[in-house]
Amino acid sequence: MHAARKPFPLFSVSEPRIRVLHFTWLAFFITFLIWFAHVSLMPMIKTSMHLTDAQVKAFLILNVALTIPARILIGILVDKYGPRASYSILLALCGVLCIGFAAAQTFEQLAVMRFLLGLTGAGFVIGIRLVSEWFPAREVGIAEGIYGGWGNFGAAIAKISMPILAVTVFGGEFGWRYAIGLTGVIAIIYSVIFYRNVTDTPKGATYFKPKKAGGLEVTTKRDLAAYILMNLPIYM
């Protein structure tokens, strides 16, 4: 008979790997909070900035336009510099961009900030690598499920909390700016907390990095066609 499997120690924060899991899903949560902070505030932003319907629709495209290529780029950076530094820098950078979006005075400024904020969607790949470094094979599935599931909840919290912050807490014409700017400040502060409390691997383990980046070799026309199709989303 097989020994009974121990329950996943989700709240055993005295264990280093569990602490890292909570720090990591919260980082992912904050990236989604930033990424979707503007969605429920678009009616207020539209009125305040005198935007047209076409301009509002443009934000929907700009919000995700950079995400796919950014995930590839961030993945390369994670391999080279490690998830701890990569996540900390991404949080700080996107926090600054979020404040820039909140302070924008023209549609063009809003559009540029919104486009660049698509970087936040790349945070997902960082946490996947970090969690896999900290958890054994028998636990990595549930750990990554918690990371992804709880982190994604940031989008729902953004939808609920942003109008409350903008209207009830801050109020006035610039309430939406203060609400969105606050999420940027939170991200910047958390980037420091994350960097100071997380390591790439458990104590004594080695973080393996690629020895050298090289081009992907293809040897047949069929492989070349497959490679082109695989990369089409980057340019669409």
Predicted regions and their residues:
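Flexible cytoplasmic inter-helical loops of multi-pass small-molecule transporters
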Residues: H2, Y195-R222
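Extracytoplasmic
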Residues: R19-D53
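Residue-level signature of mid-helix packing/kink "hotspots" within the transmembrane helices
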Residues: F36, N63-I72, A122, A156
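Conserved MFS/SLC helix-loop-helix module at the cytosolic interface between two early adjacent transmembrane helices
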Residues: P69-F107
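MFS-fold secondary transporters
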Residues: L97-F101, L117, F194
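Short hydrophobic/alpha-helical segments at membrane-entry points of transmembrane helices
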Residues: T106-R114, Y227
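Cytoplasmic helix-loop-helix junction between adjacent transmembrane helices
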Residues: M113-G151
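Helix-loop-helix hairpin linking two adjacent transmembrane segments in secondary transporters
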Residues: Y147-D200
